[in-house]
Structures are given as structure tokens and as C-alpha cells.
């Protein structure tokens, strides 16, 4: 009608809207949206971070480029971390924490090292780390198994997306102030529009639109070997169809123990996949996953020049396979 006021959704869906606000208002599903990595390599780097933090922080730029090249195609994802609220860079030699975490179920591990010279990371065997072999982490960095609490990595990099700073930094501060140990700020987890986003290690499950209560529950669950599915984006060990399929099986089967479900096979290609999820006890499920474009168009990140229709993963069906069907 001429002269009528635009609807609430019309006002929100502009390129200047905060991407997380719009995504939440449209109830965009978070399942099947996690960043993919079989292994995470996390380097403590105080001070400010740029949008591409490995080459736009106080870390030596040439070293950042070399680390990116070394990790390319190996399944290792590198990110910088810092303590909540501690953004000053004192300069000079200082001990840095380094973590490596392999997230493939059945072979999960989390190791930690303390170093002064980050160039030592170039001595790592990235291909082996991506495949789950942690020996070079011990040999090059003196790393050992992490014996402390699970880690909560909160994306706070406002140079990457303002929602990460506006929503992530308060969450990291709240968790830290409440006595939760193992909380770090991290440079990038993908999916800015799901801020605050959090990665929980060692099991590698990411969470979107995360509140302090959910993350505390997820950390308690990780400590007990249990996966919290509320707000879960998926396990980084799997691709996006696999992430959605695994979470669907957890809900259908009521199986929340970590490490017992694996994506054993994926057939098909976009926009439709048949994903086989296996249990350690021998059970199997076939999950139909369909990709579609999210509607209406919305900002996929803050400051995006155009509105987008991000892909979403919808679970169409979950079917438990009987022994006679396993060979098909």
C-alpha cells in the first residue's frame, strides 16, 4: 500500500544491518555451519589483530605467510589466541602458549606447549598433524598432553566482523570473570552472523549465538565426554553435510557421548547428499541432507556490499540401517 511503513523485516534486511541480529531474527539454523579442520593449531599472540590475523597482527608477517603455506591442504587450521581483555602487546620475549587439537572421533587429542620464538612452529609436520599424528608437536615444541580443563575459544576479532567484537568479547569476559578456566579469545571461526561463536576443545564442536550458560554446559560436557547439541554448529572434523547429519543422529538416537559417532561415508553432491553415520557399537544411520539457499537475502557479514543467500543444510530424513541394508 502506498505510503505504508516498511515491515520490521524489511527494515532489518539492509547491508548496514548487523549480520548477527538479522540472522537471529530470521531464525537461521546453525547446524552444519562449523568451520572444518581435522586439527587446530592455536598460537598465543597478544596485541591487536587485523582481518587476516596471521599476516596483520604483531606476529611477523613473513612468518604468518609461511605458516599459512605450510598448513595449506593439510587439514590443519591455524588461529591466534589471546587472554580475554588482554590486548596490550608488551613486546620483547615472552612465553606463549601453543595448543594443537585433533578432532576426529576415536582419535581425539589436545596437546600444549610453551614457547618464546613462534618461528619454532615451522618445524612442525603439518601433514602429520592433520592426519592425527602429534609426534612433531612434541619434537619441535616440547609439547605434552593438555591436562587442564577443556578450552573455550570465543571469536572476538572485530576487524574481521564487528559482531564478533560486539558480541564475542563480552561473552569471553563474562566466562572469564565467572571463573571458567580455559577461555581464550580467538581470531576466526567463520560464520560471523552466528556470533557469538565458540569452539570447544578437545572434541571440536562449535556453537553459535552462544550464551554463557550454554558454553558452561558444553565445557562441563566436554569434561565428562559428552556433547551438548543446543546451539551446536557441528564438529570440525566433518564437512557441512556430515556435521548436520551427525547432529541429527545424536538427537534421534539420544546418543550424546563424545567420540562414538563418525561420518563413515558421504554419497552424492550438492545440493543433495546421503550421509552414513556410524556408531562405535556397529549401528548405522543413513541421513538425507539437502542444501538450499537461505531466504530472504540477508547480510552474510557486517559491512557486506550486497545481501546474500547463504547455503543451509537441512536434514530431510534419518533412517537406521538394519544389518541387511549395510552392504547396499
Model-derived regions: residue spans:
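Histidine/cysteine-enriched polar flanking segments
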Residues: 2-328
Amino acid at each position: 500500500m502506498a505510503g505504508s511503513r516498511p515491515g520490521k523485516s524489511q527494515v532489518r534486511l539492509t547491508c548496514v544491518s548487523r549480520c548477527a541480529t538479522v540472522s537471529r531474527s530470521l531464525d537461521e539454523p546453525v547446524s552444519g555451519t562449523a568451520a572444518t579442520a581435522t586439527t587446530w593449531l592455536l598460537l598465543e599472540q597478544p596485541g591487536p589483530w587485523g582481518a587476516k590475523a596471521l599476516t596483520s597482527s604483531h606476529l611477523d608477517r613473513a612468518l604468518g605467510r609461511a605458516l599459512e603455506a605450510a598448513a595449506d591442504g593439510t587439514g590443519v587450521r591455524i588461529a591466534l589466541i589471546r587472554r580475554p581483555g588482554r590486548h596490550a602487546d608488551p613486546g620483547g620475549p615472552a612465553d606463549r602458549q601453543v595448543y594443537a587439537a585433533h578432532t576426529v572421533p576415536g582419535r581425539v587429542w589436545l596437546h600444549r606447549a610453551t614457547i618464546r620464538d613462534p618461528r619454532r612452529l615451522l618445524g612442525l609436520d603439518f601433514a602429520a598433524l592433520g592426519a592425527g599424528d602429534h609426534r612433531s608437536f612434541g619434537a619441535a615444541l616440547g609439547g605434552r598432553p593438555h591436562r587442564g580443563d577443556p578450552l573455550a575459544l570465543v571469536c572476538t576479532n572485530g576487524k574481521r566482523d564487528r559482531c564478533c567484537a560486539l558480541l564475542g568479547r563480552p561473552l569471553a569476559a563474562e566466562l572469564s570473570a565467572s571463573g571458567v578456566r580455559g577461555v581464550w579469545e580467538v581470531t576466526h571461526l567463520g560464520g560471523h552472523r552466528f556470533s557469538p561463536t565458540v569452539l570447544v576443545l578437545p572434541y571440536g564442536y562449535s556453537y553459535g549465538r552462544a550464551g554463557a550458560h550454554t558454553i558452561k554446559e558444553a565445557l562441563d560436557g566436554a569434561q565428562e565426554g559428552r556433547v551438548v547439541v543446543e546451539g551446536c554448529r557441528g564438529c570440525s572434523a566433518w564437512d557441512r553435510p556430515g556435521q548436520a547429519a551427525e547432529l541429527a543422529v545424536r538427537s534421534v538416537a539420544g546418543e550424546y557421548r563424545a567420540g562414538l559417532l563418525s561420518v563413515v561415508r558421504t554419497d552424492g553432491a550438492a545440493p543433495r547428499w546421503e550421509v552414513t553415520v556410524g556408531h562405535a557399537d556397529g549401528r548405522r544411520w543413513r541421513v538425507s541432507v539437502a542444501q538450499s539457499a537461505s531466504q530472504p537475502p540477508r547480510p552474510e557479514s557486517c559491512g557486506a556490499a550486497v545481501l546474500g543467500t547463504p547455503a543451509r543444510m537441512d536434514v530431510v530424513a534419518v533412517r537406521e540401517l538394519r544389518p541387511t541394508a549395510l552392504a547396499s
